From Swiss-Prot:
Protein name: Putative T-box protein 32
Chief location bin: nucleus
One term of GO molecular function: RNA polymerase II cis-regulatory region sequence-specific DNA binding
SMART domains: TBOX
DNA-binding region: 18-199
Keywords attached to this entry: DNA-binding, Nucleus, Transcription, Transcription regulation
InterPro entries linked to this entry: p53-like_TF_DNA-bd_sf, T-box_DNA-bd, T-box_sf, TF_T-box, TF_T-box_CS
A Pfam family matched in the record: T-box
Compartment list: Nucleus
Gene3D superfamilies cross-referenced by the UniProt entry: Transcription factor, T-box (2.60.40.820)
Length: 441
């Protein structure tokens, strides 16, 4: 180690300082952290050194201070625990050494210092002016190196720099706040309590599709239009649907009427056994073929009336026109009305409204004729299936059939009255009770 007093011929020139517990040499250039806070914190590194080259008989006083290495300001890069720092930029703070802290042992001989070494315990550092003694004022993010001053009893002093031990100061509070801030940001973005940004719903304006004239749709609208507000039925097809919902299908109505006819016939009113036999026959759907044929003929006539009503001139015209292609059949070409209405969509639309009015009047007349025909048919059905006076008299005689079940119930009550005393007398003998019960039965 060189000294600033090397030009003087004194024994201080040969002093050597080594750090105890460290194998580092002066060629090492990495830094060790010294945490600084507003309050006093003790230096985490051991300030314990061995000394060589002192005069054993002379008295020496040893003190320590921290000096700036360079004019750079350092920046942390990498792991916080690793202490990876590098010079970042020039520092605006001038290079000044800290105050010296004198060892508590005072003046001691060179032999004693070389034997025990020198140790500075509980030296604190702070980034503000400390209120306590034995505390050094340091700047954050700057590099320092310890310097030992040897003072003899004659007043000669020598400073020895310990280059094998370098420090860089960092603020614990600032680094922890940065880590805390980063952790908070991570929780806000990925944690369960992360703030959810409202979703922006984009509305795209749909393109307006122009309507295309279609003659088939116009005719369908004509069939779905009601004849008038006072009319009971919209069309024969609608009437048939309502009739099916009200009375069921034709086969169900046929079966229901045949059951009633057979139950009211004079042949089935002769005795209760015959009535039970007729009910069994009706449950098996074995009906009279003659009545079923008459009902089939009636409803076939009704279906024929519906089919004749649905066929109108507009149906024939719509079949001869191909709506998907611009071609015309021979029937439409020979007809002058088609040539006049197919000139343009407007003309076709006008003719469709005219045909709509005529079809409404025609449908109204056909519906009136259809209703008259329905009245006539159902009157015939009522006359055909209305029971005669003889059948009604036979039905009144059916009340006498209830006497037989009453007599049977009286006999069963008498039987129970005969069994009850036997059960009370022979409770202990179970075999006698069962024997008496089977004999009575």
């Amino acid at each position: 180690m060189t000294s600033q007093y090397s030009n003087y011929s004194c024994p201080l020139n040969n002093i050597q300082v080594n750090v105890i517990g460290s194998s580092r040499t002066s060629d090492d250039h990495f830094l060790e952290q010294m945490l600084t806070k507003r309050k006093k914190t003790n230096i985490s590194q051991d300030l314990h050194y061995t000394l060589l080259g002192l005069n054993p008989r002379d008295l020496y006083q040893i003190s320590i201070k921290l000096a700036r290495i360079d004019e750079k300001k350092y920046k942390f890069n990498g792991n916080f625990n690793g202490g990876d720092y590098y010079p970042h930029k020039n520092s605006e703070i001038p290079m000044e050494d800290t105050e010296e802290i004198v060892h508590l042992d005072g003046y001691q001989t060179g032999a004693r210092w070389m034997k025990t070494g020198v140790y500075f315990p509980k030296i604190g550092i702070s980034k503000e002016q400390p209120d306590k003694e034995r505390c050094l004022l340091l700047e954050s993010l700057h590099a320092y190196v310890p310097v030992l001053r040897f003072t003899t009893s004659s007043g000669i002093s020598l400073e020895v720099t310990v280059w094998s031990q370098k420090f860089v100061t960092t603020m614990t509070s600032s680094n922890r706040s940065v880590k805390r801030r980063e952790k908070r940001k991570l929780e806000e973005t990925t944690g369960p309590s992360a703030k959810k940004t409202p979703e922006v719903i984009e509305f795209t304006q749909e393109a307006v599709v122009p309507e295309v004239y279609n003659a088939q749709q116009v005719y369908q609208m004509q069939n779905d239009t009601m004849i008038s507000s006072d009319s009971k039925f919209c069309s024969p097809l609608a009437f048939q649907q309502d009739f099916t919902e009200e009375f069921g299908t034709i086969s169900q109505l046929d079966a229901y009427v045949n059951v009633n006819v057979q139950s009211c016939s004079s042949s089935s009113l002769s005795s209760p056994a015959a009535l039970q036999q007729d009910s069994t026959v009706s449950s098996d759907n074995d009906f009279d073929d003659k009545n079923s044929e008459e009902f089939d003929a009636v409803f076939e006539y009704i279906d024929q009336q519906f089919s004749n009503h649905d066929q109108n001139p507009m149906d024939q015209q719509s079949k001869s026109i191909d709506l998907n292609q611009t071609t015309w059949t021979s029937q439409s070409i020979n007809n002058q009305s088609y040539l006049s209405t197919a000139s343009s969509p407007a003309a076709l639309n006008q003719d469709s409204f005219a045909s709509e009015k005529s079809s409404i009047v025609r449908d109204k007349k056909n519906d009136e004729n259809c209703l008259d025909e329905f009245d006539r048919v159902f009157n015939e059905l009522d006359q055909q299936f209305t029971p005669t006076e003889n059948q009604l008299q036979d039905l009144s005689n059916c009340t006498t059939w209830n006497q037989e079940p009453i007599n049977n119930s009286i006999q069963s009550n008498q039987l129970n009255n005969n069994i009850a005393p036997a059960l009370e007398e022979n409770v202990e003998d179970d075999n006698a009770i069962f024997e008496h019960f089977f004999i009575c039965n």
